[in-house]
Amino acid sequence: MAKKALVNKANRKPKFAVRAYTRCQRCGRPHAVYRKFGLCRVCLRDMAHKGELPGVHKSSW
């Protein structure tokens, strides 16, 4: 319940613009969020492995 409240709080427009921060759209994690995808590193990796993100694949060399 606390996480939902924090997600709702992050979605509101803050009084000052510098107080705004990004959260993962999938799980609500506040750290390590990629702006391009709107996902945290954990969800990004998970979705990339499942093939749910078009154009993203694991590189190997």
UniProtKB/Swiss-Prot annotation:
Keywords: Metal-binding, Ribonucleoprotein, Ribosomal protein, RNA-binding, rRNA-binding, Zinc. It comes from the Bacteria. Its cofactor is Zn(2+). One of its GO terms (cellular component) is cytoplasm. InterPro entries: Ribosomal_uS14, Ribosomal_uS14_bact, Ribosomal_uS14_CS, Ribosomal_uS14_sf. Binds 1 zinc ion per subunit. Zn(2+) binds at C24, C27, C40, C43. GO terms for biological process: translation. Pfam families: Ribosomal_S14 (PF00253). One of its GO terms (molecular function) is structural constituent of ribosome. Belongs to the universal ribosomal protein uS14 family. Zinc-binding uS14 subfamily. HAMAP family: Ribosomal_uS14_2_B. Binds 16S rRNA, required for the assembly of 30S particles and may also be responsible for determining the conformation of the 16S rRNA at the A site. Part of the 30S ribosomal subunit. Contacts proteins S3 and S10. This is Small ribosomal subunit protein uS14B. It comes from Nocardia farcinica (strain IFM 10152). The gene is rpsZ.
